[in-house]
Amino acid sequence: MNNARYTNSISVLLFFLPCLLFSAPNIGGISGSIQKTITNSAGDPASSPVFTVVSAGVTGDAIFSGQLASVTSTTISFESSSDSSETTVNPFTSGVFSSSVKTPILTASLTGSGVGSIAITYAGTGFSTAPEIVIDYPTSGDDQATATASINGSGAITGISITSAGSGYSVAPTVSVVGGPHLVKLTESGDDDEGRFFLITDNNATRLTLDISKLANGETLQNVLQTDFSVEVIAAPTLGSVFGTTSAELDLSPANANGSGAGADWVYLYFGDYYSFCFMPAGNGNAAGWYSTSIMGWGMLNDLIVYPDEAFIMAKRTNGSLTLDFEGAASTTDKKVQLPAIGGAFVMNNPYGTDMLLAE
């Protein structure tokens, strides 16, 4: 089962006003979980799907935290540091957050209580520098396995070398890379924009290039992310990270074959219009993964962003029941939400987890 986290209390909103931001007042801290079961018992479930609206929370620790050294209209930069040998240490590996990167799928196998090998289930593409390999901690103890990657001219991973097998593993650990879709989150305490997210589209060793399309009219990046402000870099929720990248991780029903959405449960995302996606098995020269149900030319979409301040629609199009665990903590700080322009729409999640009134 995939260990994704979901939050609910969602609103689907259609707006007839100019694009703007609104802020909700602080409330006390609230946390908890809700388990939701979706059942479809129709004679023809694909023609009579059962819908629900949910959102993906940001999970996992920040891969970097620091203060901004400088800000331009589209970039933010950080200072380098030095280790005990006075060797310069840069915060990032160049190119790993590029929008052209597709993250690999890596699978570990054990030899005894250590990691013996890591298979490349899907090699990914687009890396200009070999990414850092991250292997989960062992079941017992803290002797964590380590490994390095090599890439080819297309930026695909061609090999994984185990540098330390570690010990204390009773089950094969999850293996990931530091790369692919990541977000910058403003963590400057007390600032009106605390909690705002920006997608990273490219990077070098000290600089991040950001997508500024979510800035409201009249806003600039320099106004929101100011010099010396504190930020975090975190992995962005994606179709693959939320729902799984292999059939073993998947809770939803996959398609019968690659190239068709038949037999699958669907996920709808909204970006200008609704588009549906499902997990498809390998076939037709394509690896197993997430694809559009109608536009196969988009290719594998495991890395398609599911923004943490937006929600999505799930369609149970197969018979049976699907149980989802909705977990999360309510925010205790003001949140600004960008409302669409006149006639626009988006599926909005409630950052507080309680009733929220949209008012003047």
Summary of predicted features, one role per range:
Residues 1-25:
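Sec-dependent, cleavable N-terminal signal peptides
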Residues 60-71, 106-111, 147-153, 197-203, ...:
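Short, exposed beta-strand/loop patches in secreted or surface proteins that constitute
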Residues 107, 132, 146-148, 174, ...:
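Well-ordered beta-strand positions in beta-sheet-rich domains
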Residues 120-121, 160-166, 214-221, 291-301:
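Signal that preferentially marks extracellular ectodomain short beta-strand elements
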Residues 199, 273-308:
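A cross-kingdom feature marking solvent-exposed beta-strand/loop segments within repeated
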Residues 267:
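Short acidic-hydrophobic catalytic motif
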